[in-house]
């Protein structure tokens, strides 16, 4: 697919994210943007909080999908017995114009008992020192109540959270909130509050439809510049798949000309008496150009959580496609003058499409919808969007019917769609990094957050080989990780090996390494006198006396005040395997 492919991991990670905590800009995309780098999307973050200035602030921000609004039900039941007044607001939807006289006034009436202010304390891990966390940060954002006593906000508002409080309008009391579910790809989260006092007088907002162009919306929230609720109004100017900066994702978004500022994140955009979307990011360097997450994406997220009990992600077909706008290109693949489509150039080995499609197939239609030569499909009122939107609208494990031209003959195949993960994770919020230390060698799985530790210009300053593999390589089997030597903690046992850092681990005692857990098992279960580790396409080798290395590991950990040689996630898995083995032996 053009935008939802595994190559999106590269393309979408390169968006300007100078205001985003943990994300860095890649200049190669800025060069392709023909001078428009100052107008790239930024995650609208939470406001600067009134905490001491020395405390670092939380700043909010590719491979992804969108969804089908016709499959989802609206969430309309109120939290309390108080009812939201249903106002009769007429609209000429066919013309795409709003006749609502005062959308801001209507939004205020709805928001007073629905929109809340969110206070978050968060702590991010250090990827260079994975056994440590960075300093604590405080931030603020917005959210609103939906049916079922739930609060919707942005994922970046509560990312890496350690403590969350909410406060409703007109109250001085903050209530403890728990994060029930987070979808970082779609930048959405669900909070729950146990306090009965909090829910007194609160009303649930109802999710509406995608607004048409030029329809009026009002964004409600708690942006910087004050402590009370704020309402800004504007009109819809564009509806199309957009870069979701926080999740490095491509999903449908709505562009509006209402001011969306830090602190607005998670607040509702209200159209009439329903929610049209959730405010989440804006364009740096541009005035009053903001983006809201549309209701189909919100409903997909909520429905997935309700059905599966957790966030399930957005589907991908797992293909990378080339536009076929050139006539000679179409002729070369035996396309008739009436045919349109896109050319399959790469296929993710872990996708269902890998077993069905072939390189140089031409995708003609998806679920009966013709695909144009530029990869777009029709979308209401003569608008067009990329066909990735249709793919991401599917539920996990749902099938799609694709029409394919192969060697001049048309075929139809049924393909199962599911969320796909890249070989190198694009983000790792709300979890501690994995690591394993042996003989002073710090082994970690390569992630893009690790590369971001190299600074703002990480695309150029991080190790070139690792950066290339992070953006280009595809997983060949499930559970595969790219394991590297992050650094070498100096000791007599590793003298002479101190420069063998930032290299990939390929083999341990001749066995190819699948992931960090596998490497840990290979080393811990070594039964030979010598331990051999092959690095970087077997061009570098480490040989250690195994028993001496085990003794040295304990001394190195004590010297560097490291509590454990193995991260908690690997330790838990290792203990479980030991318990299972003991049970089997009994």
From Swiss-Prot:
Active site (UniProt): 156 (charge relay system), 187 (charge relay system), 265 (charge relay system)
Name a GO molecular-function annotation: serine-type endopeptidase activity
Q: Which Pfam families match?
A: PDZ_2, PDZ_3, Trypsin_2
Listed A to Z, the keywords are: Hydrolase, Mitochondrion, Protease, Serine protease, Transit peptide
A GO cellular-component term linked to this record: mitochondrial matrix
- According to the record, the residues making up region (Disordered) are 60-96
Q: Please state the Enzyme Commission number of this protein.
A: 3.4.21.-
Stretch forming the transit peptide: 1-22
Localization: Mitochondrion matrix
Major subcellular site: mitochondrion
> Which residue ranges are recorded for the region named Serine protease?
117-302
Q: Where is the PDZ domain?
A: 318-398
- Basic residues bias (residue ranges): 84-96
The processes (GO biological process) annotated in the record are: proteolysis
Gene3D superfamilies assigned to the protein according to its UniProt record, in alphabetical order: 2.30.42.10, 3.20.190.20, Trypsin-like serine proteases
User: Which PANTHER family is this protein grouped with?
Assistant: PROTEASE DO-LIKE 10, MITOCHONDRIAL-RELATED, PTHR45980
Q: What does this protein do?
A: Probable serine protease.
Q: What family is this?
A: Belongs to the peptidase S1C family.
Record protein name field: Protease Do-like 10, mitochondrial
Q: What does the record give as the organism's lineage?
A: Eukaryota, Viridiplantae, Streptophyta, Embryophyta, Tracheophyta
